[in-house]
Regions:
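Mid-to-C-terminal alpha-helical segments outside catalytic/metal-binding sites
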Residues: 1-6, 16, 24-50, 218-219, ...
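Histidine-centered catalytic micro-motifs
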Residues: 3-13, 163-166
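Conserved, mostly hydrophobic/aromatic
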Residues: 7, 43, 66, 97, ...
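Catalytic metal-binding/acid-base residues of hydrolase active sites
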Residues: 9, 57, 167, 200-201, ...
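Short, acidic/polar
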Residues: 32-42, 87-98, 179-180
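Active-site gating/metal-coordination segments in enzymes
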Residues: 50, 59-144, 151, 194-200
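Short hydrophobic/aromatic-enriched beta-strand-loop microsegments
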Residues: 77-81, 160-166, 250
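Catalytic pocket-lining loop regions of alpha/beta-barrel enzymes
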Residues: 117-231, 277-279
Length: 279
C-alpha cells in the first residue's frame, strides 16, 4: 500500500529572498521553518511515502519553496498551490497552471471576513468557471461552514472540490468540533465534492486510537465512500504522533476493508488529482 498524505506544509523563515507578507497573516506552526528534508525524515518514520505540499498562509501567495521541494524530491512531493485571484494576469496564470512541474491544483482559504464575503458576492465567479474549464482541482478551507461549498458545486458541476479538515471548526474539539457534520454529509450528493479526513486526532478528546471520532468517520464513509475521502495529517499542527495518525486508518476503524484503506490512504487522492502512484 502506497501511503500519501493529502496535506503537509513546508516553509522557510522570512528572509529577503523569500519574504512573508507584512504584517504576518498568522503565526507559523513551528519556529525556524520546516524543510522538505525534515518532512521526509518525519514521513519515513511514520511510514508515509508521498505528500501533497500545501504552502501555508503565512508565506503569502508564493509557491516557490514547495516547488523547490518537488524539484529536489519529485517522487515524494507534489503541490496544491496558493493563487492570487487579484493578480492582473490571474486568468492567464490559470490557463497554464497545471503545466508547472509537480503542480496538481490550487488551495484556497476562506478565513478572514473580506475573503469569506467573496463566496457570496460573485467576485470569484470567473475563478470557479476558469478552474472548471481548465480542469484545476481545488482544496478549500471552510472552517465550520461546509455549506458554503454548495452554491459552487451547483453552478460548476464539473469543478473538483476537496474540503480541508472535513470543513470543521479548527479551534474546536470534542462534540463542538463536529457540529457541522450534518451539513457536510448533506453535500455528498454532489459527486465532485470530496473530503480531506485530515488532522483527525486534533478533534478528539481521547488518547489514541481516538474512539470518540470513529462514529463521525463512519458517517463520512457511509455518505462519501472511500473514493472521496482522503487521509491527511497537517503534521506541523498535528496533536500526537504522526505514526499514530497513519496507523488509525491502517489498523483501527473496523468498518474499513483493506481495499477501503488503500483508497483512503492514497489511491483515491492520486486518482482525483491525477498524481499516478509509482513504486
Amino acid at each position: 500500500m502506497l501511503v500519501t498524505d493529502a496535506q503537509i506544509h513546508v516553509w522557510e523563515v522570512d528572509r529577503p529572498g523569500r519574504p512573508w507578507p507584512q504584517p504576518p497573516r498568522n503565526q507559523p506552526q513551528r519556529e525556524g521553518g520546516f524543510s522538505a528534508r525534515e518532512a521526509i525524515a518525519e514521513m519515513d518514520a511514520a511510514g508515509v511515502d508521498r505528500a501533497v505540499i500545501v504552502p501555508p498562509t503565512w508565506v503569502g501567495e508564493s509557491n516557490a519553496t514547495a516547488l523547490d521541494a518537488v524539484e529536489a524530491y519529485p517522487d515524494r512531493f507534489a503541490v496544491m498551490g496558493r493563487f492570487d485571484t487579484d493578480a492582473p494576469d490571474a486568468e492567464q496564470q490559470l490557463a497554464g497552471w497545471l503545466d508547472q512541474p509537480g503542480m496538481l491544483g490550487i488551495r484556497v482559504t476562506f478565513i478572514a471576513k473580506p475573503r469569506i464575503e467573496q463566496l457570496d458576492d460573485g467576485s470569484l465567479d470567473w475563478f470557479w468557471a476558469a478552474c472548471e474549464r481548465h480542469g484545476i482541482p481545488l482544496m478549500m478551507l471552510l472552517r465550520g461552514v461546509p455549506e458554503q461549498a454548495q452554491p459552487i458545486a451547483e453552478r460548476y458541476p464539473d469543478l473538483t472540490l476537496i474540503l480541508d479538515h472535513m470543513a470543521l471548526n479548527l479551534s474546536a474539539e470534542g462534540a463542538a468540533a463536529w457540529e457541522s457534520m450534518d451539513r457536510l454529509v448533506a453535500l455528498a450528493r454532489f459527486p465532485r465534492i470530496n473530503v480531506k479526513v485530515s488532522s483527525v486526532p486534533n478533534f478528539s478528546t481521547e488518547p489514541y486510537p481516538h474512539r470518540d471520532v470513529h462514529g463521525h468517520l463512519r458517517r463520512l464513509y457511509d455518505a462519501y465512500g472511500p473514493r472521496r475521502l482522503f487521509w491527511g495529517s497537517d503534521v506541523t499542527r498535528l496533536r500526537g504522533a504522526y505514526r499514530d495518525c497513519v496507523r488509525m486508518f491502517q489498523e483501527e476503524l473496523d468498518f474499513l476493508s483493506d481495499a477501503d484503506r488503500e483508497l483512503i490512504l492514497g489511491r483515491a487522492l492520486a486518482d482525483c488529482l491525477n498524481w499516478p502512484e509509482q513504486r
